[in-house]
Structures are given as structure tokens and as C-alpha cells.
């Protein structure tokens, strides 16, 4: 299938290009994909054994539904950045990258979340070793448009959308099973995203402390059943309470992925890594704070996954203790019903000069109420205005 569209500048042209690529890839998928995609669950896809290695035994292709937990450009920099193989000098240099996470919407019937990943320069992987196996900057741009917009409505995906992902490849790495292209630019390995409901709403974060995910000796709590510990929260939106930063080196939204790490503690010997997102979340807290974000795992291994848990930080809420102040104020009240009045004051009862009090008037228990600073030399009166 081929669609010819007039090339124009601006957002409309981007939409048209996205439509064209979607249609072309749809045709390729029809020709190359075997069978009909079946529905999968996050819980099944992320199941692991005692070593944290994937036990998923399902088949491809499959569909997976969930709430998008981030904007598509919130984790990785997807700006086109072709890096040539150069006889192996740029091995493992993937150039531009793209990643999202989405979480089960109905946690009564499913649990957990899944990451989707795509890189530009697969040709720089040692098992590929060829520029022909990487996306050019133009081809990469088309891929990003294909994934960032719903192919039917042209809705630009954002955090809080309910989406369905069709996967034709998945790989276990870093302690979790990811939906990927298998480091392959062949359209047969594409994953697709479709909109179910826009602005569905982010799930309420699961509230935890470090004692829920770390032992007293500061080791990770790993439970292969995923009923407790780190595995229970992987891929989900959580709120970790009562943290204090030990270092702020990685507290910078403009740093690269590997340089956005900070270490926090609960003050009881437990520590945890926070990975700053590409969004500004404000200055690094100097005291206790609560952290909201996506519970992630980066074990650095393709064969085990019992370590490397972290939080992709999306919000930091300072929890500095507030001091309760008792202020001495003059409280002036008069009935709401009846004629309209203004409050006036003077410092000399023998004077004919009165000044209107402009402080805000609020209604409390049927009484107009206004507060003023206490003063031994200030006198008040009501003056009828109608």
C-alpha cells in the first residue's frame, strides 16, 4: 500500500507523514506477522523466577493495555542523532532513544507495568555492525511520529492516556521484559500504539517507604511471586515517603540518562536511587521529601534481575515541618443579612476623619468577618452604604 501526500511545512505535514508511515507499516505487518494478536497481561509478561529472570512463555504478537505514565519524551532524548558504525568505533552507541512506561489500568484483574523501548542506531550493536541496520535521521523521525501519535485520531500521546500496545517482539533485559523492536529496523518487528481513551487519568501512586522495598541491611527485598518487595511495584506509579538526598549530582533534567541518578536515604540505613526525568521538578530538596515517579529496574543484565531497582522521578514534595503560629488579631463581625456596610477606623475618637478598612471580608457562620492587626489606638465603626 502506498499513499502520496502533498508535503507541507508545519505540524500538519508531520501528521501526514505519520499517517503515511502507519499505513505502510500496517501493510508490512499484514504480510509478515503470523496470526492475530492475543491479549496479554502485565502480570504474566513480567513474571520471573528466583533469579529474577523472565518466565513468560506466551506467544507473539500480543496486545497489552494500560495507562501511559509519562510523556513520550520524558525519559530519553529522541532527537535524531545518527551515529555511524565506523568499523566498530561507535559500538553500543545507539544515538537517539525513545521509551515509555504504561501500567495496568484495572489492578483488580491485572498488576504491574511494562516499558516500551526503541533506539535509532541498532547497527552499532556488535551483533549487527552495519549502518544499513540503523535508522537514518529521516527514517527515525518517521518512527517517532508513528509512535507519538494515534494513527486514527492523530492525538498526541501524553501521560494519563489509556493506550493499547501491539507487540511483535519482546526482550528481557535489566530485570524486566520490555516491548522492543529486537534491535531490528525491519517493520515486521514494529510495535504499535493505539489510543483507547484520551485523558483517562494517571493512577493514584502507591504509597510506600524504603522499608517496603529494602531490608534493614539495605539489600533489595526480592520476591519472585511479586506479592511483596520491589517486584510488586515494578513498572507502576509510586510515592516513596520520608526521603532525604545524600547527593544532588544527578538532580538535573538536562543530564543524560546515566548522569541523572541521585541517592536518597530514609535515615535508617536504607538508600535508594532516584533517576531524574527530563522534566524540571524544581530544586533539590534540602530536607525530607516525598518522591513520586515510575518504579523501574536496571539490573544491567540479560540473565538475572534481583537488583538495580530505582525510581524515575517525576515529582518531589518537600515535607519540612511547619510551625503553627498563633496570631493576635482584631476580629470584627456583623450580620450578613440587612443593609450593606463598610468597616472604618480612626486613631482619635475626637476626630471626624475615618478611614475605610480594606482588608478582605469573609463569611463565617452567617457573619461578615474581617481581621485586622491588634492596636491599642485604633477604633472601629460600621458605616451603612445603602
Where are these regions (language model features)?
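N-terminal compositionally biased, intrinsically disordered segments and leader/signal-like regions
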Residues: 3-5, 23, 42, 210, ...
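Short, composition-biased motifs enriched in small/polar/acidic residues
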Residues: 319-386
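Short, threonine-centered small-residue motifs that mark membrane-proximal processing/anchoring sites
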Residues: 37-39, 343
Amino acid at each position: 500500500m502506498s499513499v502520496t501526500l502533498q508535503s507541507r511545512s508545519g505540524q500538519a505535514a508531520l501528521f501526514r507523514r505519520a499517517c503515511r508511515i502507519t499505513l505502510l507499516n500496517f501493510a508490512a505487518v499484514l504480510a509478515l506477522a503470523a496470526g492475530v494478536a492475543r491479549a496479554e497481561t502485565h502480570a504474566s509478561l513480567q513474571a520471573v523466577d528466583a533469579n529474577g529472570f523472565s518466565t513468560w512463555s506466551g506467544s507473539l504478537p500480543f496486545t497489552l493495555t494500560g495507562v501511559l505514565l509519562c510523556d513520550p519524551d520524558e525519559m530519553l532524548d529522541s532527537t535524531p542523532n545518527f551515529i555511524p558504525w565506523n568499523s566498530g568505533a561507535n559500538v553500543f552507541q545507539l544515538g537517539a532513544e525513545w521509551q515509555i512506561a504504561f501500567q495496568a489500568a484495572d489492578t483488580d484483574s491485572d498488576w504491574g507495568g511494562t516499558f516500551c523501548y526503541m533506539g535509532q542506531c541498532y547497527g552499532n550493536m556488535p551483533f549487527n555492525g552495519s549502518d544499513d541496520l540503523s535508522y537514518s535521521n529521516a527514517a527515525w523521525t518517521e518512527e517517532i511520529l508513528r509512535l507519538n501519535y494515534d494513527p486514527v485520531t492523530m492525538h498526541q500521546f501524553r501521560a494519563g492516556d489509556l493506550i493499547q500496545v501491539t507487540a511483535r517482539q519482546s526482550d528481557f533485559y535489566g530485570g524486566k521484559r520490555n516491548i522492543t523492536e529486537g534491535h531490528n529496523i525491519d517493520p515486521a518487528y514494529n510495535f504499535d500504539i493505539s489510543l483507547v481513551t484520551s485523558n483517562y487519568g494517571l493512577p493514584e501512586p502507591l504509597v510506600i517507604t524504603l522499608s517496603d522495598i529494602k531490608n534493614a541491611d539495605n539489600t533489595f527485598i526480592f520476591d519472585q511471586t511479586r506479592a511483596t518487595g520491589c517486584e510488586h511495584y515494578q513498572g507502576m506509579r509510586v510515592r516513596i515517603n520520608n526521603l532525604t538526598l545524600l547527593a544532588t549530582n544527578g538532580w538535573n533534567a538536562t543530564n543524560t540518562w546515566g548522569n541523572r541518578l541521585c541517592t536518597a536515604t530514609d535515615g535508617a540505613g536504607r538508600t535508594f536511587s532516584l533517576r531524574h526525568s527530563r522534566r524540571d521538578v524544581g530544586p533539590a530538596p534540602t530536607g525530607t521529601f516525598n518522591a513520586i515517579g515510575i518504579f523501574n529496574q536496571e539490573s544491567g543484565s540479560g540473565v538475572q534481575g534481583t537488583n538495580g531497582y530505582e525510581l524515575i522521578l517525576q515529582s518531589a514534595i518537600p515535607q519540612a515541618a511547619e510551625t503553627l503560629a498563633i496570631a493576635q488579631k482584631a476580629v470584627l463581625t456583623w450580620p450578613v443579612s440587612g443593609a450593606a456596610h463598610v468597616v472604618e477606623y480612626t486613631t482619635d475618637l475626637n476626630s471626624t476623619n475615618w478611614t475605610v478598612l480594606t482588608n478582605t471580608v469573609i463569611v463565617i457562620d452567617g457573619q461578615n468577618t474581617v481581621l485586622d492587626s491588634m492596636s491599642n489606638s485604633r477604633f472601629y465603626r460600621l458605616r451603612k452604604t445603602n
